[in-house]
Amino acid sequence: IVSSQYQEKDHQCNTYMKLLDEDNDYIWNLDCDEIFKSRDIETIMEVLEEFKITSVGFRSRSFYGGFDNVLGGFEEGAEFMRIRKVYPGSYWATHRPPTIAHTIPIHERLPERHLDHNTLDEKLGVRMYHYSYVFPQQVKQKVSYYKAAVSKQNCIDDYFENVYLPWVTGSQSTRSRIEEEYDGVHEFKPSVRGSCRTKPFEEEHPEIILQNMDKLKKKFEDQLNEFRTH
C-alpha cells in the first residue's frame, strides 16, 4: 500500500534529508508509534556527545493487543537501528535495513562506532517503546502493507482475521491456543521468525502515553467495536 506523492520509504526519507541543516549532527528516525522516555532521550544525547557514537540500535518493547502485553522472543531480541551520524550531503542508501550513506571523504568523518541494543539496554536501561500492534486499524493496515509490498510470502495468510483479532477479543484459553498454534502472535510465519509470544508489561509507559492513556484506550475500544460489528 503506497499512497501520497512518494513511491516508497526510500523516496520519502531522502526528500526530508534535503531539508537538514548543514550543522545537524545526527538523524533519529522514528515511526509515529515509536516512543521514548524523556530521561532516556537525555541519556542518549549525553552518550552521543561524550563517546562520539556514529550509530545506535535499540531493543523494543513492542505492545500487542492493547497496552498491557508486549512481544518477547525474536521481536524483543531484534535490533532497531534508529540513530545515525550525518554530514552535509548524507542520504538514505536504503530504509530496509536503515542505512545512511555519506558523500564527504572518509577522512573527514568520525570513526564508525556503534552502540548496540544489548549494551544500551543492559548498561543504561534504555529501550524503545513501540506501540506497533495496539490499534486494530493500525495492525490491519500494517500487515496488509507488509504482505503486499515487503515480506510477502513470509507473512501468515489472513493474519488479522486468524491471529490478531481472535487474540484481542478472545479469552485467556483462546489466546493460549493461538500462541501455541503459531508459536506466538507476530505476523511472520513461525518458520521464518521463531518464537514470538506475548508477556505482561510490568514497567511504566512513557510520560506522553500515560498523559493520554484514557483517550488511547477509548480509541482502541472504539476501533475494536467496529470490527466486532462486522
Predicted regions and their residues:
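Short beta-strand-to-loop acidic/aromatic patch adjacent to the donor-nucleotide binding site
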Residues: 23-37
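Catalytic-site signature of metal-activated, phosphate-bearing donor transferases
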Residues: 7-14, 35-230
